[in-house]
Amino acid sequence: MALIKEPLKPTGALDEFRSFDVTPIIGTEFPDASLKAWLEDPKADDLLRELAITVSRRGVVFFRRQDGLTEEMQKAIVQKLGVLSGKPATSSLHRHAHQPDPNADPEILWINSEENKKLLAGTPFDPALPARQSCRGLWHNDISYEPNPSDYALLRITQPPALVVADLPAIDTLWASGYEVFDRISRPIQKFLETLTATFGELRERDGSDPKFQVPRGSPANVGTNLRPTHPVIRTNPVTGWKSVYAVGLHVQTINGLASDESDGLKKWFTKLIVENHDLQVRFRWNNANDVAIWDNRCTYHTATYDHEGYGIREGYRACGVGEKPYLDPNSTGRREAR
């Protein structure tokens, strides 16, 4: 039967560029390609449309040493990825209402390890906790607390910590495949989960008088401080037509219609499927200044590694696109079934 949206098919437009799959399930790297060159190429739309398809199929795509890539170029790439793959005409780039630097471009989130400590202070994930024994709760997808959350995101790390400069591994980022989490679940439970929705939200209450919340944050649907939308537990990615488990991570408040113990049990089980199946994860080491990752928030989750205390600041810039309102297409399939 026909899908709500016809999936996009790869065209081979990127075949001339050297690439490799980092793992069989998730992650592809283009070790020599230049995003700046692709953006400025006369065939830019063909290249970036194919990149969008690749990111949506592989979850996350990596690029090395993207020197010369500016924040404006990051924004242009992320917006084009969404537009060329069919996102709503009313969706643009997310405006981060709690940007650490009030004078910064609201469509670029400044990522800074020292500022991140402040955001996590007083939460169960505070890096300063003397006996912090688990980081499993930090897995998340970006801005799922918005009514229309993210499609694609692009992170460029401009300043790796001194550990990396000294050629020692530190503060890698991990991604996990929501497609594969769905495919690891037995069919009867899949069908049950497809009947459920979840309430999402932020960790902190917001000041309703803050004017930054009174303008659209990348979509007319994303206005105001009531950041508690309802999304399906199982979501269809319109670019691929594949199902993934969406209700995972720190922004998920509750699975609707269930007793609290049942909801908490499902949330913990979803996270367990990630952390106990490392073959559905990919780990990326930020080797150089201006290394880049682009991922699809509809079908992946990610988390940083907090192992660089005392070795300097980690800094970067993220552009985050806004896509469609999440939905489950009853005629869509899991990735394995589609293949």
UniProtKB/Swiss-Prot annotation:
Its BP terms in the Gene Ontology are: terpenoid biosynthetic process
Pfam families recorded for this chain? TauD
Q: Identify the residues that bind substrate.
A: H96, R318
Task: Using the UniProt annotation, give all residue ranges assigned to the region (Disordered).
Answer: 207-230
Cofactor list: Fe(2+)
**Cofactor stoichiometry and binding?**
Binds 1 Fe(2+) ion per subunit.
Q: Name one GO molecular function term.
A: 2-oxoglutarate-dependent dioxygenase activity
Cited InterPro entries: AtsK-like, TauD-like_sf, TauD/TfdA-like
Q: Where does 2-oxoglutarate bind?
A: T173, R314, R318
| First and last residue of the signal peptide | none
Q: Give the EC number(s) listed in the UniProt record.
A: 1.14.11.-
What the protein does comes down to: Alpha-ketoglutarate-dependent dioxygenase; part of the gene cluster that mediates the biosynthesis of betaestacins. The bifunctional terpene synthase btcA converts isopentenyl diphosphate (IPP) and dimethylallyl diphosphate (DMAPP) into the sesterterpene betaestacin I. The C-terminal prenyltransferase (PT) domain of btcA catalyzes formation of GFPP, whereas the N-terminal terpene cyclase (TC) domain catalyzes the cyclization of GFPP into betaestacin I. The cytochrome P450 monooxygenase btcB is then responsible for the six-step oxidation of betaestacin I to yield betaestacin II.
Hey, which family's this protein in? Answer: Belongs to the TfdA dioxygenase family.
Q: What is this protein called?
A: Alpha-ketoglutarate-dependent dioxygenase btcD
What is the organism field in this record?
Neocamarosporium betae (Beet black rot fungus)
